[in-house]
Amino acid sequence: MVFPFIMPYEALAINILIFGLFAMGFNLLFGYMGLLSFGHAAFLGIGSYLTGIGIVHYSLPWGTAILVGVIGAAIGGLIMGFLAIRTRGIYFSMVTLALGQIVFYGFYKAESLTGGENGLRGVRVDSFNILGIPVDFLNPLVKYYIILFFVVIAIWLISRILNSPLGAVMEAIRENEKRAAACGFDVTRTKLLVFVLSAAICGLAGSLRALHLSIVPIDSLHYLQSGQAVMMSILGGMGTFFGPFVGAAVMLYLEDVVTTFTRHWMAVIGLVFMFFVLFFPKGIWGTILSKLNMNQDTK
């Protein structure tokens, strides 16, 4: 739909789709449950690596490889969540960080499968058929729309989750965990379920990234990726539906522009982030929603 307007920046547009989805998956746990995880890079990396391994080492069809990546990330989320949700506050964050680093080290050492520090190369998807119609994945237009399709489906699923009874329970737990438990809600089970759903969505983002890059860099699992998800969510507006996506778009666009002028782009991004935290604590999208609501109230 919008592809003609973003040429020749299709790589940036695809990255925004992928990391926007990653941030939205993270925000499901952080923004809607109030649980700050520093280990979500593990799920981005698990999705990327399992999809890549499936294609490179086992010649799986790309659709099956994506499914393997998502399921693998969900299983990883189940294990990490089971261990982490028994803690609270900063302890929860530190446990997820430690577990994420264990996952990083595990994939780093499995060189025969993952390529170690060089990453996994050769994750190529050249062409395939959909309903008998040949599709060239190397065509940027085709790649953009295929990734957009998966992202739209995932966003729809997130919307369904938030508008379901589970979404109401999530909000109740975020606002007052003890009161939610007193009302009869299974807080621990809900936390674990949301953790798994969040991990699966982040795993899908990782799978799509592997197909987009045709390689899986080891930094997919690095804790800095988790930090990016935190920054994108806060920058756009944590606890808002599209906020993390907006944050991802702004952050990646700034990175793309600033890197052409200076190698110290991270410092510039940091200053922008501090500015919004200090003066727009609700984030970009959150501030826009607040202004719109105020305008409606005055009418």
Regions found by a protein language model. Give the residues of each.
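Hydrophobic alpha-helical transmembrane segments
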Residues: L12-A13, L17, A42, G63-I71, ...
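Single transmembrane alpha-helix segments in multi-pass membrane proteins
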Residues: M7-Y58, F82-T96, A172, E177-A182, ...
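Residue-level recognition of pore/gate-forming positions within transmembrane alpha-helices
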Residues: F19, S48-Y49, V70-A74, L97-I102, ...
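Transmembrane alpha-helical segments in multi-pass inner-membrane proteins
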Residues: L67, K191-F279
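Alpha-helical transmembrane segments within multi-pass membrane transporters and channels
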Residues: Y58-Q101, V246-G247
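Helix-loop-helix "hairpin" substructures at the membrane interface of multi-pass membrane proteins
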Residues: L138-P217
